[in-house]
Design a protein with these regions (language model features):
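Short coil-to-beta transition motif at edge beta-strands of beta-rich domains
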Residues: 2-14
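N-terminal switch/interaction subdomains of large nucleotide-dependent motors and GTPases
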Residues: 4-6, 21-31, 36-323
């Protein structure tokens, strides 16, 4: 236990049923008191005579410095995993590997250059593990394995509401689209280019009809989706299919307080011109409709309903939709 009694030493402090990362603030040999400061602000005073390894134990160097792949952590428990994710998050390193699994922490902000064309190009030229963890590394490995293994590949994206599943899906599709356009062999035909554009640009339409504001997430997907991409032998995207399931149909007629119906209804009222509103006998605002206003929330400062309407109308042309 002597190694713990050094100011600045990093330790794990057990608090009830959880472990807290902490630092030894001071150690008085006169009265035998050890002062520990948890990373979350709590200060704990412990008598050295009462110390045991169940209460306080040294933090492994890998947990102190942080690692890119958590399978290499010297101590593998829930607290070490969460602490490592937090260490990287504080440095804007939102991606961390756990073996072949990629953990992503939503930064709730834009990180400059993280998804730039230069980064796409960089990850397209390296194998998994050669560069820092990134969703582009997963997408590239998936694309390469199509040809290495001559078999279909699958990427599963899961997480709680607001974790970033929708954005992660967009980024995967973005990377695969670039790889398709840059693939060798015959240059992509005009038809193939339209297919790529339709798949990439499907997100605004899917979000408009399937996403809604909830108390936890202003752009929450209220459905799941299964996306299939079909590649030619030369590596081009030649087709695709998006299947939705478990749509929250009851939201159309009832929403919890502070939530909204699906985005499309509000964007239609915000973006449609007078002629279109008159044609469909629409009122000027969502407040006139019980199904849109019963929750007490019809607008949100973070949502641009008019812009979404414009996006849906523009990107709907990529599908060559008919009305």
């Amino acid at each position: 236990m002597d190694s713990f009694f050094v100011e600045g030493a990093r330790v794990w402090l057990r608090d009830k049923e959880q472990l807290l990362p902490a630092t030894v603030s001071s150690c008085s040999h006169d009265d035998g008191t050890l002062v520990l400061t948890a990373d979350y602000g709590e200060v704990v005073y412990v008598q050295q005579s009462e110390l045991n390894r169940d209460k306080v134990f040294a933090m492994h160097p890998s947990s102190i410095l942080g690692v890119e792949d958590m399978s290499s952590l010297g101590e593998l428990h829930e607290a070490a995993i969460m602490h490592n994710l937090n260490l990287r998050y504080q440095k804007d390193n939102i991606y961390t590997n756990i073996g072949s699994i990629l953990a992503a922490v939503n930064p709730y902000k834009l990180i400059s250059g993280l998804y730039s064309p230069a980064v796409v190009d960089q990850y397209s030229k390296h194998h998994l593990g050669e560069l820092p963890p990134h969703i582009f590394a997963v997408a590239n490995e998936c694309y390469r394995c199509l040809w290495k293994r001559h078999d279909s590949q699958c990427v599963l994206i899961s997480g709680e509401s607001g974790a970033g599943k929708t954005e992660s899906t967009k980024l995967l599709l973005q990377f695969l689209s670039v790889m398709s356009q840059n693939s060798g062999g015959t240059p992509p035909s005009e038809k193939t280019t339209r297919v790529e554009q339709a798949i990439i640009q499907s997100s605004p339409i899917m979000e408009a009809f399937g996403n809604a504001k909830t108390v936890y997430n202003n752009n929450s997907s209220r459905f799941g989706k299964f996306i299939q991409l079909h590649f030619s032998q030369s590596g081009n995207i030649q087709g695709g299919c998006i299947t939705d399931y478990l749509l929250e149909k009851n939201r159309v007629v009832r929403q919890n307080p502070g939530e909204r119906n699906y985005h499309i209804f509000y964007s239609l009222l915000a973006g449609a011109d007078r002629d279109l509103r008159e044609f469909y006998f629409l009122s000027a605002g969502p407040g006139a409709y019980h199904y849109l206003s019963q929750s007490g929330c019809v607008k949100d400062s973070s949502l641009d309903d008019q812009h979404l309407y414009t996006s849906v109308m523009r990107w709907g042309q990529a599908f060559e939709t008919r009305t």
